[in-house]
Amino acid sequence: MDIYRAEQRILHLLAQGGRIDIEKDENRKITAVACITRDGWRAGGLDIVLFRKLKRRRCIASTGGRPYRITQRGLELVRSQLDNQ
């Protein structure tokens, strides 16, 4: 399955140890998402539509209320790059 450039960028950051933080409203609906790199910087390019697409493809998952991380399926989809760890 091919993934688009924006998805590839986010998955690459997550493969290096990044995470996705979410904000919810009082009805527990997701209102905002932010991709945080392993260094603690906020990366651009992630919106709610892209977040839902990655979640639907099972590339990211959250366990126990923790931030979203890349899954094994996401690691298989991300193309290797020289600085991936």
Predicted regions located by residue number:
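Short amphipathic alpha-helical interface segments
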Residues: 1-48
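Short hydrophobic/aromatic segments of transmembrane alpha-helices and their interfaces
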Residues: 34, 50-51, 59-60
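Short, charge-rich amphipathic interface segments used for partner binding and complex assembly
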Residues: 43-44, 52, 56
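A short, conserved structural fragment
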Residues: 55-65
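Minor-groove-contacting beta-hairpin "wing" of winged helix-turn-helix DNA-binding domains
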Residues: 66-71
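Short, amphipathic alpha-helical interaction segments positioned at domain boundaries
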Residues: 75-85
